[in-house]
Amino acid sequence: MNPHERIERHFSAHIEAAQEALTMLGDAIEIAAAKLAHCLLSDGKILCCGNGGSAAQAQHFSSEMLNRFERERPGLPAVALTTDTSTLTSIANDYHFDEVFAKQVRALGHAGDILVIYSTSGISPSVLSAAVAAQDRDMSIIALNGRDGGTLAPLLRDTDVEIRVTAPSTARIQEIHLLITHCLCDLVDHQLFGE
């Protein structure tokens, strides 16, 4: 396969994954956006976490909320739990890496807040621990998950929202998670600030 054919294959796989996500996940995205807007209107905040590329996506979502998406508006309270290297490394060193997000959720999260989890597999112990900590704090969870949902999917309650991209490729899951993130940002802005 030559380079151009490889490029075409990536674009085709992306388009196919996006179309499947639109068909399968539109309702869940809409529900998640409504929950985020309700949380913010109720003076709650959003905490975000993930590992690796999913950490970058958590930071991206948080920055779009805190700063702006595609229009001028006041900043919205969102915190990426992935950014403070002193906190992350002290928790990992003093306790265990599994606790890097959970300890922050227990310290910062309150009833009515939302934890947004990004995971391509649903099996990372650190996000699983964060989910349990959020539930203990009576927080809702929005999980941008992947593949078969892993161990995360069965942890979720009826009040939580799972947006699961079932693509077999980590790259495709991350691409669709980014598209979903932008949909959530747009819908939250629309619900809070109108057209």
From Swiss-Prot:
BP GO annotations: carbohydrate metabolic process; D-glycero-D-manno-heptose 7-phosphate biosynthetic process
Protein name: Phosphoheptose isomerase
Cellular compartments annotated: Cytoplasm
Binding site for Zn(2+): H60, E64, Q174, H182
Keyword Cell membrane part of the UniProt annotation: no
Further comment: The reaction produces a racemic mixture of D-glycero-alpha-D-manno-heptose 7-phosphate and D-glycero-beta-D-manno-heptose 7-phosphate.
GO cellular component: a single term: cytoplasm
Catalytic activity: 2 D-sedoheptulose 7-phosphate = D-glycero-alpha-D-manno-heptose 7-phosphate + D-glycero-beta-D-manno-heptose 7-phosphate
Occurrences of domain SIS (ranges): 36-195
Main location class: cytoplasm
